[in-house]
Amino acid sequence: MLRCQRENLDNVIFHDPMKKGDLALAMAGADVGMQILANVEAFYYGTSPNKFFDYLAAGLPVLTNYPGWIAGLIKESECGFPIPPESPEAFADALEQAADDRARLSSMGGRARMLAESRFPRDELANQLVDVLEDVIQA
């Protein structure tokens, strides 16, 4: 944020923290969901960021900068832009592709939503959680 102020960047917006329920409205105005993490190997397979699932549910293509299961899923489902970590060039290229091909972006968003519904159905996941919690309580 300080860098944006220092360099007078007016094309970057920082929002205050918001409630989870307000995210859908904020994401409705977005073109791409960006999941950017530090290049830490433990993140490749050991994270499951909520924002990834929020973007899928909102029908947003996902741009992610680290390898691992999420990048593989994005590539396999063609619902976004998996880019290598620590590659500003790949990041810029992905943003240019997103801006230059709105039809492709829309298709990716549709596939993101389909992925959310097919692989991560809320009701089924909630039922699985209830089953686990009931097992723990009974143990």
Where are these regions (language model features)?
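Nucleotide-activated donor-binding/catalytic signature segment of Leloir-type glycosyltransferases, i.e.
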Residues: 1-25, 29-32
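Amphipathic alpha-helical segment in the mid-to-C-terminal domain
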Residues: 20, 88, 105, 118-126
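Short alpha-helical segment that forms part of, or immediately flanks, the ligand-binding pocket
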Residues: 21-24, 28, 47-58, 68-72
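Acidic donor-binding loop of glycosyltransferase active sites
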Residues: 27-45, 60
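Structural loop-to-beta junction motif characteristic of Rossmann-like glycosyltransferase folds
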Residues: 31-32, 52, 59-62, 79
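A short, well-ordered alpha-helix in the C-terminal region of glycosyltransferases
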Residues: 90, 97, 104-118
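C-terminal alpha-helical cap of glycosyltransferases
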Residues: 122-139
